[in-house]
């Protein structure tokens, strides 16, 4: 799910630039990416505020997850987009579990009125208290299949994102939609509102006033006219989480096409408001590109027998309802995020709030992959924006320890951005081929498919495919606060590049990280990349080079969540000494790329007389703080013997 606050301005830009940018397909593509990209941290922050509101206002499931296993819903609803009201029935089929206690429970808001419940063709007594329907049904065996039909009506409550919303379009036409993630389904229909139980299939039959159309999950089986109403029948035959079941109603204009994918042709449907249909249809090529790309990069689209679609709605963002995302617009930023949720979030759903990154970080990262594939040169900019946003604060980790704190669960900087950055670092650490094969292995796991997963499941597949122990990688980047800071001092001595690298951390008291890190060496415009093993708080690296270096840069492709400070040391002699301030007078700092010892440093004036001074050697042995009496103007020489018995001198000017 994404909250996009700038979709209206993007839509206006369509009209402004359409005639100019229709010159070539390439220009159209670049424009479509550009107008849909707003500063991602703004989008994600607004989205997180909505997520927090939703989490605060919506109560969790009351039903006993261990009592029954829901297998099927038959939903029959009567709605009118001009009236906030719903009536109908829900048939629920389920299996009894070993833990069945004699009571069947479903979630249903107290704002809804339950008229009656049929069980085995007979009316059954029930209680409806504290947003929960309870029925006593005795004498059933483990695994036995049973069902009931709940008849109800009422004015749905509004919680979280609204749950059940009636509104008007930009030109005043009535519209309604539902948005249940994660605990709003009970506000408008009786169900088992669970994050651990997916129904195997559903049928949805909706009656609406003629002139409206209904968008929902799965395939549209039929549309019939009965008196003054349209009756739409949608059928979905894949396991689905309760919060992903949805309907949207308005005077939609509809268009569709068959899109060739790796395993056949996929139906792609779009339900757009008439006033926006032109913009939507013009931007549809973005959707087609993304579906084909993800389908070939990962595993085939998970709901291939049915469809993928978009239904326009009035909430300023998007929601990844299974096979039919509800969208404010279909610009590339929003579209690619919601589409990728069909693999990461719908097909495989995170099993706990601690692991929410398996949904949101992955969808965020796949937006970046869309830019990498289709917007030449924008992916590094996108990564740099991500990194800048993550580093705007020093602390924070991806996995959530306190799942009762909404600020922790829905932190946009961490749940979305930092998690996406971790995926990019993993990709660069184990290599592209292994990384994407690991994603495919994860998605192909039959124990996770159409079910729920935890971070440990993802790690298992990445370790299996890479044949590497990635414990340290994931512990550092997912479970540890903050990020490393590297101070790199360098000097070239003939054919050797001498590097002194000190590592600190954005959060004090954190154990230092170990990781590989790229450094770019430049010579007359030519770039050579070396990979460094960073594994201590203070290390000295010497690289043999056959050329002179003009400059160095680190992580040129913006792949690592590491802050660096680079300093070139002016080399005098073979040992690369630096003294500053130079010129100076009485207090100096002497630095070396090799370890020093106080007794090995002597100071002489221009006629060879030794000058006495006081000094303090740093704990790491590379820096000597020097204090002298006020010096006469002139040239002085420091003579240095380092711990590895290398002799060198450096000149100093006093003034």
Give residue ranges: language-model regions.
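N-terminal, polar/Ser/Thr-rich
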Residues: 25, 35-87, 171-173, 470-472, ...
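Glycine/proline-rich low-complexity spacer/linker segments in large multi-domain proteins
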Residues: 65, 142, 151-203, 558-582
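Acidic/His/Gly-enriched intrinsically disordered linker/tail segments
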Residues: 360-429, 446-449
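Hydrophobic helix-coil surface modules that form long, contiguous segments used
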Residues: 88, 180-181, 192-336, 365
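A surface-exposed beta-strand-loop module
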Residues: 38-41, 109-169, 542-546
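C-terminal outer-membrane/trafficking sorting elements
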Residues: 32, 571-580, 584-655
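Zinc-dependent metallopeptidase catalytic helix centered on the HExxH motif
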Residues: 325-381
């Amino acid at each position: 799910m994404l909250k996009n606050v700038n979709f209206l301005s993007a839509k206006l830009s369509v009209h402004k630039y359409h005639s100019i940018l229709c010159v070539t397909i390439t220009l159209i593509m670049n424009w479509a990416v550009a107008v849909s990209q707003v500063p991602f941290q703004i989008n994600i922050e607004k989205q997180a505020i909505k997520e927090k509101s939703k989490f605060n206002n919506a109560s969790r499931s009351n039903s006993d997850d261990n009592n029954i296993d829901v297998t099927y819903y038959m939903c029959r609803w009567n709605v009118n987009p001009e009236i906030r009201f719903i009536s109908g029935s829900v048939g629920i089929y389920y299996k009894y579990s070993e833990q069945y206690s004699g009571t069947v429970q479903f979630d249903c808001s107290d704002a809804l009125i339950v008229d009656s419940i049929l069980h085995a063709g007979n009316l059954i007594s029930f209680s409806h208290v504290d947003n929960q329907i309870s029925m006593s049904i005795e004498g059933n065996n483990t695994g036995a299949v049973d069902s009931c039909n709940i008849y109800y009506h009422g004015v749905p409550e509004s919680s979280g994102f609204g749950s059940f919303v009636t509104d008007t379009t930009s030109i005043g036409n009535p519209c309604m939609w539902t948005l249940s993630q994660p605990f709003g389904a009970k506000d408008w229909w009786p169900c088992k509102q669970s994050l651990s139980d997916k129904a195997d299939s559903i049928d949805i039959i909706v009656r609406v006033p003629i002139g409206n159309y209904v968008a929902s999950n799965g395939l549209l089986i039929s549309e019939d006219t009965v008196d003054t109403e349209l009756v739409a029948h949608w059928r979905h035959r894949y396991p689905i989480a309760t919060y992903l079941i949805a309907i949207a109603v308005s005077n939609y204009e509809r268009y569709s096409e068959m899109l060739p994918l790796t395993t056949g042709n996929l139906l792609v449907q779009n339900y757009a408001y008439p006033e926006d249909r032109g913009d939507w249809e013009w931007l549809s090529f973005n959707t087609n590109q993304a579906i084909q790309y993800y389908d070939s990069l990962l595993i085939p689209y998970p709901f291939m027998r049915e469809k993928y679609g978009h239904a326009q709605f009035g909430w300023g963002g998007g929601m990844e309802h299974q096979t039919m995302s509800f969208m404010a617009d279909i610009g590339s930023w929003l579209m690619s995020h919601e589409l990728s949720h069909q693999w990461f979030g719908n097909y495989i759903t995170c099993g706990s709030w601690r692991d929410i990154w398996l949904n949101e970080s992955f969808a965020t990262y796949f937006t970046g992959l869309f830019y990498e594939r289709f917007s030449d040169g924008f992916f590094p900019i996108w990564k740099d924006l991500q990194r800048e946003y993550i580093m705007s604060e020093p602390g924070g980790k991806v996995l959530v320890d306190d799942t009762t704190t909404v600020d922790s669960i829905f932190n946009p900087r961490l749940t979305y951005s930092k998690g996406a950055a971790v995926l990019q670092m993993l990709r660069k650490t184990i290599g592209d081929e292994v990384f994407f094969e690991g994603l495919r292995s994860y998605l192909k796991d039959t124990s996770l498919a159409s079910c729920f997963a935890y971070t440990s499941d993802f790690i298992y597949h990445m370790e299996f495919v890479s044949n590497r122990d990635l414990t340290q990688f994931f512990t550092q980047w997912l479970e540890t606060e903050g990020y490393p800071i590297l101070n790199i001092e360098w000097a070239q001595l003939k054919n050797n590049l001498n590097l002194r690298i000190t590592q600190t951390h954005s959060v004090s008291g954190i154990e230092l990280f170990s990781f590989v890190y790229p450094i770019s060496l430049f010579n007359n415009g030519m770039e050579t990349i070396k990979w460094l093993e960073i594994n201590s708080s203070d290390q000295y690296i010497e690289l043999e080079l056959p050329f002179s270096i003009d400059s160095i840069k680190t992580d040129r492709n913006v792949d690592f969540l590491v802050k660096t400070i680079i300093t070139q040391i002016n080399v005098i002699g073979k040992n690369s000494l630096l003294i500053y301030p130079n010129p100076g007078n009485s207090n100096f700092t002497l630095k070396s790329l090799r370890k020093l010892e106080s007794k090995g440093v002597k100071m002489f004036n221009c006629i060879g007389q030794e000058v006495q001074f006081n000094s303090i050697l740093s704990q790491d042995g590379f820096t000597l703080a020097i204090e002298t009496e006020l010096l006469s103007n002139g040239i002085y020489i420091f003579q240095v013997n380092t711990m590895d018995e290398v002799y060198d001198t450096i000149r100093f000017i006093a003034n």
